[in-house]
Amino acid sequence: RVPNPAVERTQGKILLETLESIPRNFDIASASGESTAPIWEVILPMCTSSAELQRIYEYYRKIVVGKKSVRIADTTVSEWVGKFAPEEISLIPLVENREALSSADKIVGEYIDGKRFDYQRVFLARSDPALNYGSLAAVLLNKLCLQKLHALEKETSVEILPIIGVGSAPFRGNLKPTNAINCLKEYPSVHTFTLQSSFKYDYPESVVRRGVQEINDTKRGKPLHVNEEAVNRIIDKASGQYQKEVAALSQLIHTLSRYNPSRRARKLHIGLFGYSRSLQGISLPRAIPFSSALYSIGIPPELLGLSALSGKELDSVREMYVAFDEDISDSTRYICKENVARLPNGVGKNISRVLSNFDCRPDGEYSEAARDVLDVALSENRSNLTDAIMKTAWKRNFLG
């Protein structure tokens, strides 16, 4: 995974350094007796155009490998320092915002045009679209994207192999060892599911192995059909309401996220709403601390934004998102109705109205722990807030 100079201007040279390291890694592997290139694929995050891919593809071929035939003094570069391999690399676009997900077929189609590729991998983000537009919008965007990529595959005869990055939290995809089958049914055309740390480390080993086996044993199929017009109409309504409700809760989210236990360091992706996130002048944290903040006080974030949809629109969602009711009901295990009633600016009333459309299954012990988190967060003494947040995280088997 490399920086995208179109977005991360100050890290452009890191991209070039990374590309230059690929032949060096090949040399190390060759010295160890390996004949296969250890690095042959590069993921480009926040990809929004085929030109971004083409620049890297050509730079590697023309500059990194191409300099082998350049003469310096009395010899060529390759005669001087050895061969450069592999001859070319595969570029994987990571599409993360609504515009890129909706036009991924165009981005990929333009990039593969005129090239003799047997296959092309495409990486669909799941967590950051949820952070930007809401969980429902993220699911529908992914489904629409997969449908368009399948059409591109049939049109070009180039096998398109989608990757989807999902987390264990319902808000971020609900892919956990105990729910792998539902994800496979929801996204039958996906070739690769990325497994995040919660999947691997927060369940018994036997359960994790069974979940991985289920994923590996399932053959790819065709994507489930979605109506593009209905998808865009629902996303417009739900995401608009979601952003209003997030703005109303932003101060509380910030307070909680500051006490969220840090799991890893990661550079911000400048300019992407979900990374260095800004909404109506309000800055918000990344996906993990964001969702952890809301889950920890008993407010499942996948409920935000749904109040904008009518009963008929929810039925339309159910036709396209087969595990919709199950995912929402799963998330309501982590709800604290007392805390819902304490939310400002009408958000609590909106959530209560949403809950009437689903089978709500709150966990009493979890609700009590979530109430304690909010009590501490609203108090003057927050010294125990991180411990209180971790208590809820252990109960749900994921942080955020």
Residue ranges of model-derived segments:
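Catalytic alpha/beta active-site cores
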Residues: 1-121, 191, 290, 310-400
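Catalytic or ion-translocation cores adjacent to nucleophile or general acid/base/metal-coordination motifs
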Residues: 83-87, 101-233
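Acidic, glycine-enriched catalytic cores built around paired aspartates
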Residues: 191-192, 200-400
